[in-house]
Amino acid sequence: MALRPEDPSSGFRHSNVVAFINEKMARHTKGPEFYLENISLSWEKVEDKLRAILEDSEVPSEVKEACTWGSLALGVRFAHRQAQLQRHRVRWLHGFAKLHKSAAQALASDLKKLREQQETERKEAASRLRMAQTSLVEVQKERDKELVSPHEWEQGAGWPGLATAGGVCTEGAAEEEEEAAVAAAGAAGGKGAEEEQRDVEVVAAPVEAMAPPVEAGAAPMETQFPHVEARAASMETTEKLERILLQLLGDADQEKYTYWGQKEGDLRSVETATSYFSGTTNPWSRASSEPLPVQLPASYSYSYSSPFSSFSDIPTISPPQATVTAPVPPQLPSDWEAFDTSLWSDGGPHRIDHQEHPRDRRYSEPHQQRPPVYRRPGDWDCPWCNAVNFSRRDTCFDCGKGIWLQKPH
């Protein structure tokens, strides 16, 4: 008996059906043999063998019928086995789906935890950033308080820095002016101690009031101090200072005045300090010894009476253009050796008292040389009195004659 009713893998659930199929296969011995031989094969191969048997004409009909019933039993068995495999696959897919679902839930939980962690970290970072910004603002405020510029501090304190700086910067110039004023007052001869002290104070006061030199790279004084416009009047102070010096030095000898002309370079420091406020600049190059051309009006004529008229005749000239050069000192008689032809005053030649000015004797000795006169570009020598004048002056501060006048021949 090929089919067994107790075999669940046969695919048949009823025993009478199994008995009927076994009876049909038992009509020929080939029926049960065909069933047992092909029980492990696939349905396609079983069908191919059955087709070969049915097409063979030499095979009897009983064999063909028994093989056909065996093929039917194998087909049911293969169908039952395929159903079992399908159920196993479905159960596996259900389990796999559950696994995916649980994995997705776990991933969602992890993602939620990660988002919460990131949000917490973001809030902490934002809090630290705000604290850092607050600390930075406080540090900047402390730095600004510590790094307040001296000018801003002077603004808050009533501008004490200008007077202090002016006193420091002009201290050296003031001392030199005082020494020069004392020497000039001593040369005048007719003044007492009180008058000399008063003259020195008058000379030194405008110098100390001058503005200090401005350092390179410093900000413009107009933007630092509100009272810069008042400093513009320092030019007038300089003019007054020169007039005072001329009055004090009116009776001094030419050597004294020549020495004072050499000290004019010291007065340059004061002029430089004032020229900053008036917007003028002085170059620091060497002075040229070339003649200075001066344009004169075409219709101008001037007749000048020289104090040395006994030595030369003064013609009347009216040139359209003149050249001012350093004049050659006139040749004086031998009996004039004891005199100094100073043109700084209107008194003419004066007798030099060597006992009155002992410290100026070093310039009269032949083996001593006068210190050089320091010049700047544009400074000019007066053709009449040989005094050195600043480039900004149009008239000689000694004799009062203009640069545009032709020197008498």
UniProtKB/Swiss-Prot annotation:
Annotated tissue distribution: Testis specific.
Transmembrane segment boundaries: none
Coiled coil residues, start to end: none
Keyword 4Fe-4S listed: no
GO molecular function: mRNA binding; zinc ion binding
InterPro entries for the chain: TEX13A-D_N (IPR028193), TEX13A/B_middle (IPR054602), TEX13A/C/D_Znf (IPR049534), Znf_RanBP2 (IPR001876), Znf_RanBP2_sf (IPR036443)
Superkingdom assignment: Eukaryota
Sequence segments annotated as region (Disordered): 347-374
Subunit text: Interacts with CNOT1; the interaction may inhibit CNOT1 binding to mRNA and subsequently CNOT1-mediated mRNA degradation.
Protein name in UniProt: Testis-expressed protein 13A
Gene: TEX13A
